[in-house]
Regions:
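Hydrophobic alpha-helical membrane segments
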Residues: 1-225
């Protein structure tokens, strides 16, 4: 890997450099987040069931597969969608359990005020990476992420915040524009299609960015496997 850094701009530039060869398989792994909201607009009950199943089970497994695929590419191995998905499925239990634990912890922290939730979210942001890439269990992954971010909280927070602003602000503006048009034409499905397409299209970049940040932290903290 190139020089370790927590600076968001170099990480984003590197993410874009790595994107092309693995964009299509990463997009396939992210595709349920595009189709499920559309189904929800057409058949609300079915959409609700699918969304719940995806959030609880599908997203952790597919997200883990995406991280594995990116990591294979970083290691100059031939990234194969099927292999990454098989590996993620073999870790399905810790991935799903870890995702549930993370959601409960961050939600619980947010109930105490927003700041504890943000703090915990950043400290535990690499739980899925720890499970998928380092073979940690769900509980062990919490500790792994916590220790990895130790002393680097602000750097990690800024990296994710900057990335969120870079992509989030344009998406917000687009949502307002499309939402206004959809409301005028009474086309709620238009919002789901356009916003879903845009957000799904950038998920592969977020996958790569997250793995690069994770590996950079490992190198900085001397925890590289």
């Amino acid at each position: 890997m190139q020089n370790a850094t927590l600076s968001p701009i170099p990480l984003l530039q590197r993410s874009l450099q790595l994107l092309n060869p693995i964009y299509t398989p990463l997009l396939i792994l992210a595709s349920p987040s595009f189709f499920i909201p559309i189904i929800g607009e057409i058949i609300p009950v079915l959409g609700g069931v699918l969304n719940l199943a995806y959030v609880v089970v599908g997203a952790p497994i597919l997200g883990g597969a995406a991280l594995l695929l990116v990591d294979q590419h970083l290691k100059q191995q031939s990234p194969v969608l099927g292999n990454s998905l098989d590996q993620a499925i073999s870790k399905a239990v810790p991935l799903v359990l870890g995702s549930i634990l993370l959601s409960l912890i961050v939600f619980g922290g947010s109930l105490l005020f927003v700041i504890p939730g943000i703090y915990l979210g950043v400290k535990l942001a690499f739980l899925i990476c720890a499970i998928a890439l380092e073979g940690q269990g769900a509980v062990e992954g919490l500790g792994y992420s916590w220790n990895l971010v130790k002393g680097r909280w602000w750097g990690v927070f800024w990296a994710f915040l900057a990335l969120g602003l870079i992509f989030g602000i344009p998406i917000l503006i687009l949502s307002l524009i499309v939402g206004g048009i959809a409301a005028a034409l009474n086309l709620g499905l238009l919002v789901a299609v356009v916003i879903g397409a845009v957000t799904t299209a950038i998920v592969p970049i977020l996958n790569i960015f997250t793995v690069l940040l994770f590996r950079s932290l490992q190198e900085i903290q001397g925890q590289t496997a």
